[in-house]
Amino acid sequence: MLAGKARPVGDNRVVAINKGQSVELRREGEDPILTVLGEFGDERAVHRHGSHGGAPGPRHNQIPEPDRRVDNTTIWEPDFSEAYYEKLLYSQKSGVNSMANYYIEQSSNRYSVNGDVTPWAKVRYNAASYGADYCGSIVCADTWYFVDDSVDEWAKTLTTAELNAHLAKFDVWDRYDYDGDGNFDEPDGYIDHFQSVHAGEGGETGGGAQGSDAIWSHRWYAYFSANGPDGAGPHGFGGVRIGNSDYWVGDYTIEPENGGVGVFAHEFGHDLGLPDLYDTSGNTGGAENSTGFWTLMSSGSYGSSGRPVDGIGTKPMHMGNWEKFQLGWLKYDVARTGEHSAHRLGPAEVTTKAAQGVFVVLPRKVVPLDLGAPYAGEKFYYSGSGDNLNNTMTKQVAIPAGGGALTAQVRYDIEEDWDYAYLTVNGEHVQTSHSTDTNPNGTNLGEGITGSTDGWEPLTADLSAYAGRTVTLGWRYNTDGAEAEPGFMVDAIAVDGTMVGTAEADEGWTFDGFRTTTGSEQTTFANYYVLENRQYRGYDESLQTGPYNFGFLNTLQNWVEHFSYQDGLLVNYWDTSYSDNNVGDHPGGGLVLPVDAHPKLLHWEGGTADGTLMRPRIQSYDSTFGLERTEAYTLHNNGVPTRIPSLPAARVFEDSRSYWQDCDAHGCTGAHPGRHQPGWNSVDVPNTGTSVRVVSESNKGSFMNVHVN
């Protein structure tokens, strides 16, 4: 930990944050994964929202062999067998390109995975029944049916006793500390790490023959509302039961039949707790940031050797130092702005006697929070904002005999159909004038409030069923792991006209995440520069061979041209005031974004003389600082070439200068010609007077000396 007051417990793997609340800091050793292969049947399912139609199948081994004269992107094997996945995922033999070896290298031999792969199990329904994007998102809750159906079909091949004996080794970890004892090293009834592989191509690469009916690769939790077909699950945590066994699947990842090491490692990174670092709106044609090929958790999952026969995604780039730090896998130094320090940096890809990275601690960032004025008085109640919240406020309230009319004023901006607020009585959700029971994504726990209001609006609820009783009245705010909106606000809470919540004084409410606020606050956040010496070593050889551009989409939709990312010192800005890297929502800012050492924007030439920009993952290729000139390249846009010239080395990073721009001669962000906007590239750093100088590099570039001031 760089700073904080957490208290280590035991062997320091677990840290107690507050009494009765513990978190696991780092992972050591090896985790088992259960991988179930599932292929599709021919029937069309009729779900609660109707049939999605679609073609029969596919079965496995039906992906057409690509013509390598026109397709250098598709991964293909003549037989996607159990043995193929056992090698791809779990081989630890030296020199084998596998997910296990990838994680050995990322963790500097601290961590890896092993696992079992099942035979292909055929589910009843076709791919469209599980993968159609009916919900308006690229991932819909019907994928939970596929997880359920595929594990049940596989379970039919074993007796219940055989299932239980086999599955016991996959449940040794209590991920969510269900009993609150701080002991994570105990079974909890759920498979610790579950991986589903579906026949056919993934939706993220176009879906192949299935197109929009193909399942997108993702990590999620099946029926986390505990409302699935198999019941509430162990401890009420939801999930699906594996046959008639004692074990359930809750957390899962899902990947396609022809997924490479990259997509499997990326999704498993989510299972370890890492977020997406690309702009997630880009999945559906939105924005793109400049993390590009610099990290597995962005386009780096699509690294490769550059050989047409391998396709793309076979050899991912490394995680960045921020991700390795989150997992406890980084050897690092700490520097502070305004203090001179010298650091010898080894390559980020391996552990040497030198540090793999440096964290430069900056002055705390002050961010104003303007939620708007209270409905009445000087304060109101606020849920807070963020991912994975389960915030509450509760109070003992007497409901008068013959009464029970609750009124309140509410104002909210909640991620529609994904996040919800609730009115609760004795812990149960109750109906209000703002609540709904619709549940398109499986995240409404019942009578949820979602979407947004236009200012303060009245809310009513009938609590007459509790008349004459004293109850625990409460509000709850529950969010998923993405797209945190401002949240839920409530004021002037009354029962039968008697005020029970004005937020003006201590009225007996107990807060767990909720708080009172005037609506205007100033919050401070930690922020850092994260330095890493990126070299063409190990899986980062793909920085030299793997970055690509679809330069001929008008004639060759599945052909890419390759170029290299520049090795050297990568400076990332880690800003904890953000929870994501969605620069389309907040240009120039994000959770952790690379500083572009050569920030002059690159434009396509030829037929796009209107100033159309190259996409940020191309702009970011020369982001590193160092002693060498950048490489020159020629890239294409619909076959029209553009020459990118070599630029002088950038030896010094100084945050007193700007490495980000919101406009160029052709327009500003939001009004610039073309899809990609100026403000999406690089990051707007704070002016703290910090500088980082690359003083020297070894003759082979493996080590560098840097000075921080």
Annotate each language-model stretch with its function.
Residues 1-290, 709:
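Active-site-proximal segment of zinc-dependent metalloprotease catalytic domains
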Residues 30-34, 189-194, 292-293, 408, ...:
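Loop/turn elements at helix/coil->beta-strand transitions in domains of secreted/extracellular proteins
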Residues 46-93, 97-110, 114-117, 144, ...:
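Non-catalytic C-terminal accessory/binding modules of secreted extracellular proteins
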Residues 401-403, 411-420, 481-484, 539:
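Extended, low-complexity, turn-rich repeat/linker tracts enriched in Gly/Pro/Ser/Thr and Asp/Glu
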Residues 404-412, 470-478, 503:
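Extracellular beta-strand-rich recognition modules
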Residues 418, 479-496:
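Extracellular carbohydrate recognition
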Residues 447-472, 476-480:
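Short, surface-exposed tryptophan/glycine-enriched loops
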Residues 505-517:
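Short, tryptophan-glycine- and acidic/Ser/Thr-enriched carbohydrate-recognition patches
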